[in-house]
């Protein structure tokens, strides 16, 4: 893990990557491509120290409400999120400024923020997308060695009623 300060975080397509890099180790991951100009090992997570402040500035300046997307390049619920809480801080800002949220993850850690995701959905809209590559636990550990197990994901689905 290494830390950095960023000048911007919200893309022109309204996407954010709270972290840069990922520890899931998925063998098929496109985000490892050199075209994304990452100058460090993909597993060496870049923590954007000022992510929430920069996001707040960007949300304050937006003229129209929209859906903010996260998780496309780096899972917002990597192991470090438990300690750092940057994803929760950013989601709180998205909620307080009245934006919708579309979030992709492979982690059952998203359950920690279920209260906030429900609030966003009640106010605007929240879409949660969880990847299910295979139900075969042994195969999963080969192709996605550090993601939540399928049984953990299935348990999270059973524990959480639909947002709408």
Predicted regions and their residues:
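Short acidic, glycine/proline-rich loop/turn micro-motifs
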Residues: 139-143
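Single conserved hydrophobic/aromatic residue that forms the stacking wall/gate
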Residues: 152-164
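Conserved Radical SAM active-site core
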Residues: 1-129, 135-138
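Glycine-rich S-adenosyl-L-methionine
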Residues: 146-152
């Amino acid at each position: 893990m290494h830390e950095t300060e960023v000048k911007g975080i919200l893309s022109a397509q309204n996407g954010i990557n709270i972290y840069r890099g990922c520890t899931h180790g998925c063998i098929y991951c496109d985000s490892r491509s050199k075209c994304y100009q990452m100058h460090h090992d993909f597993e060496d997570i870049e923590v954007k120290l000022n992510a929430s402040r920069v996001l707040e500035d960007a949300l304050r300046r937006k003229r129209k409400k929209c859906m903010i997307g996260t998780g496309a390049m780096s899972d917002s619920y990597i192991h470090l999120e438990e300690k750092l809480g940057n994803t929760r801080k950013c989601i709180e800002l998205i909620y307080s400024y009245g934006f919708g949220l579309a979030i992709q993850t492979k982690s059952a850690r998203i359950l920690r923020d279920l209260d906030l995701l429900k609030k966003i959905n009640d106010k605007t809209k929240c879409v949660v997308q969880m990847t299910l590559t295979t139900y075969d636990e042994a195969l999963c550990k080969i192709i996605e060695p550090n993601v939540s197990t399928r049984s953990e994901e299935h348990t999270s689905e059973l524990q959480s009623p639909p947002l709408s």
